[in-house]
Amino acid sequence: MELCSSSPSSSLLRICSSSAPEISFSSSISQFPSKTQSILTKSRFQNLRICASVTAETQGLPRDSPQRLLKELAQRKTATGPKKKVPPKRFILRPPLDDKKLAERFLNSPQLSLKSFPLLSSCLPSSKLNNADKTWIDEYLLEVKQALGYSLEPSESLGDDNPAKHFDTLLYLAFQHPSCDRARARHVKNGHSRLWFLGQYVLELALTEFFLQRYPRESPGPMRERVFALIGKRYLPKWIKAASLQNLIFPYDDMDKLIRKEREPPVKSVFWALFGAIYLCFGMPEVYRVLFEVFGMDPDADECQPRSRRQLEDVDYVSVEFEGKKLGWQDIATYKPPEDALFAHPRLFRACVPPGMHRFRGNIWDFDSKPKVMQTLGYPLTMNDRIKEITEARNIELGLGLQLCFLHPSKHKFEHPRFCFERLEYVGQKIQDIAMAERLLMKHLDAPGKWLQEKHRRLLMNKFCGRYLREKRLHNFIIYSEEVHDRYEHNRRLRNPATTAVQQAIHGLAYTIYGKPDVRRLMFEVFDFEQIQPKAV
């Protein structure tokens, strides 16, 4: 390789290959060995063209002259590679808003307009709807409400104390999936993503409670398969088409002719966001109505049945209200606990804690471990009961439920399949998810749903859940069988999933007995999931 001029009259120096491996612009540089020559001929140098203007006086200088070498090196430095692409404007950071503009933006936001419904308020758009948004509402909203079975009157006519007053706005946001035209607006995109972030956990919790009460003897494995067969993303287009909503999601395409990766993400996004809006405005009973009446989900359909597996014989009793009948969605949606009920969700408690647990009352764990566990968790809570016997009965059931939370499947599952924490763990996972989702939505008003999803996942990673339980030294009270006790005590790969399951079972028990407020107390005050409380030195 050498630097040479292409002709005596040429003014350009070009890199050209030659049989003699020498560099002609300097005699002071020795010849390179063949290895160095192969390095210089790499692809990153092939596209680099060195152009230098050779003046007459440079040509007149001898080859060994230092002035000639300096001039050629100076010209060589001016050679540049290909121009770098300028990043798109949306990736260029903008200067932050000053305090005055930021305060105005938040104070004028609809998200701070409802003091009595903080969760609903946090899911409203960050700015008021504009004319383009209202155009979509005028054209399509009546069709949506008619398909879902709602009144065609504008929801703004309702009173301020009714959360359904904002249903039209949330319903509009629910259908603005990321692939549609209106999703480019910031308030629409963030509003839709925040709704689907909440809606996915609403669906999981609703179907979990439904199947736990419908199948009081079944383990969580088959129930998870039933839930997936109803709301798995590959099945959602079928439900959207059953409600005749596909033209609102794909106004320019035939949904049946789209490939899966183009059809399923928008449908899933709209489906989740729709149930987030329904839950915020009407609560869980309306979620059941839309699922089973509007979309026509059938839990008894052949495609919704779990795969056949070896079932352990269940010889224990179930509660009287489950005996001899299978509950339907109407029974669960319309159920209201009696005034003197022991628990916030009495039927769900009976579905998770078998009546036979009373045989463990007064055992060694009940006397030795239960007081320490209850003291750590802050139980029993103070309740305003009319009759003293109700308080005593609740505390007895609370103790039995706590013992079930710490009862590992290795102890009694093969003889008594429901004498373990699995069913409480299942409902605890879902109530834990929705409690954290509501917390993040109210805490981060301007965050999009995708960011909240990642934050949610990191805060609730299984290994962290078990770690919080171990920090309270509660893992020492888990009841293992004698055969596996030493293995679980000294092997973290076995111990950590078990402690995670116990923590989720505790959340499930708290939900069934005291309701969602106690789940929040355990997560954010006792176990400090967000790790924001000062640590004891």
UniProtKB/Swiss-Prot annotation:
It is found in: Plastid, Chloroplast. One of its GO terms (biological process) is RNA splicing. It comes from the Eukaryota. It holds the Pfam family Ribonuclease_3. Residues 141-283, 415-515 form the RNase III domain. Residues 1-51 form a transit peptide. Its main location: plastid. One of its GO terms (cellular component) is chloroplast. SUPFAM superfamilies: RNase III domain-like. GO terms for molecular function: mRNA binding; ribonuclease III activity. Binds specific group II introns in chloroplasts and facilitates their splicing. Acts on both subgroup IIA and subgroup IIB introns. The substrates of the subgroup II also require the CRM domain proteins CAF1 or CAF2. Binds both single-stranded and double-stranded RNA non-specifically, but lacks endonuclease activity. Required for plastid ribosome biogenesis. This is Ribonuclease III domain-containing protein RNC1, chloroplastic. It comes from Arabidopsis thaliana.
